[in-house]
From Swiss-Prot:
This is Uncharacterized lipoprotein MPN_083. A lipid is attached at residue 22 (S-diacylglycerol cysteine). It comes from Mycoplasma pneumoniae (strain ATCC 29342 / M129 / Subtype 1) (Mycoplasmoides pneumoniae). GO terms for cellular component: plasma membrane. Belongs to the MG067/MG068/MG395 family. Residues 91-111 are annotated as: Disordered. The keyword Nucleotide-binding does not apply.
Amino acid sequence: MVKVWKIGFGVFLPTALLFSACSFKDYIPTPSFRKDFSTENNFVKNKVPGKDDIYSKFYDLTFSLNFVNNQAQEFGTGWLIDWKGDENKNLSKNKEGQTASQTRSSSEQTTDQDANLFTAYIATNLHVADGLKNDQDYAPYNKDGWGQPYPYQQKTQSFLLGKYTKPNVQLVKTNYEKPEDAVIEQKLKEDSLLFIQTSTLPKTAYAAIDPVNFSYNPTRTNGFWTAGKYNVYNGGNSIGNYADFAVIEVPLVLSNPNDAKIYQEWIRPATQAYKYLGDVEGLFAKKGYRSYIQDFYHLLGYPVTKNTKSEFILGQSQGTVNHMSFSNDESNTTNTITKASLTQQPHKEQSAYVVRESGLPTLTMNVDKYTGAKGTHLVNVDQITDLSLGDGLIDFGGLSRFILQYHNVNYKQFGYGTILWDTNFGGGSSGSAIFNQNKQINSIYFGALVNVTTDRNENVGLGLGQILRAPNTFNSSHEVPYSYDLIFGDVNTTNFYAQFAKKHNTHMWSKIQSTQNGEIGFHKNSKTGQQRH
């Protein structure tokens, strides 16, 4: 397998940004994947935030994502946005620290109760979710954007969820002579990057493809955007629109030791943090234009960097797969697993790496490691000479070069974005939640601006986010609607996550049904249909 890492977005500038007098539209060309790793040194890394730290609950919510196919390993960051199942179930432990499901023999794990399913929904960027190409995905995501089967080399072979934490795993003998077992034993007592392979491949719950009913044509002289649904087969020079936001569905079979560990040690704390932060009604900000400018911005994610910390991989070995049980009843509507609905992952034996020379995902916060200063603000005219960036908010509808290929089809970015001062997280951090001083998520991080006037493609210290919920106080000068809501929907948004939540009766939908907030409850009485599946 050729290991080419696609680890995030870099947005390249053909002229020096800080001293440019041209417009933002003029010097933003097509975003492209970065294939290097970040070397920034000013951020706090590999430090689990304390319980009273503003970053603490977002640490609980956040994970590193690893998609592997025959061509590449792709890393991104994701965070819990929703779930389905009993988040209060405590998987009991015996004195050896194993979950009850781990201590049963495989022959005992055949009942529907043992095969029950907890489903985590992880938000990330659309360009990160492009790494998921699963033949058993929901339609239309089970084929490429042209309706064709994925080429074999593009198909996702395995998926792992990662976190910087105490590994809490037993020593596994490997085929490596070094590091010695004693060294590994010591490393297992320290905070490390732990990747766990889930028992099955994820699916796509939501992709922000054509969230609004407009198409984009760069050759039109009287306006680039045209009202009406875009058709990939007869679009001519037109292309559809996208926002850099997606949600993947991660099934956890609680009779599988790896899945049980993810649920018990990572997902349950994430659901508790989610509720602490305000649950569905309080977690997702929707503010007016001026409020975004006045906010302070915090970011926690997993950019790929060089560091000396250990990485451990807990794979689906034959022993763990034996703990899975499936129902053959494809009409089964209970919370059990069917063979037809999930793709079992191939075995990946457990292994340990003390140092990976090419870098590994690194827990990083936008906290200055020298001064301790936390967070940042949007870029302003005192820090940059380009007046079109003066308020730190941008309208992607007018930036012709923001084009993304998702599942082999090109789309044009729309919506609004935040430009973060001195928060240039590198590849692998794409998909991180950007949250404000009130601990509300207001946008999702998708890349850093890069200056290509030098041979080194230097990062200029500015990060980019996609705003998830834009109210009517945003006044676009372009044809696309100036309000949208990628999570709960609004009058302009025809494809949004709450449609999936309703169809699958998730935690978010249960809260939407009972809310008195008209904006969050928009879809309760909406006749807007699900656009993608």
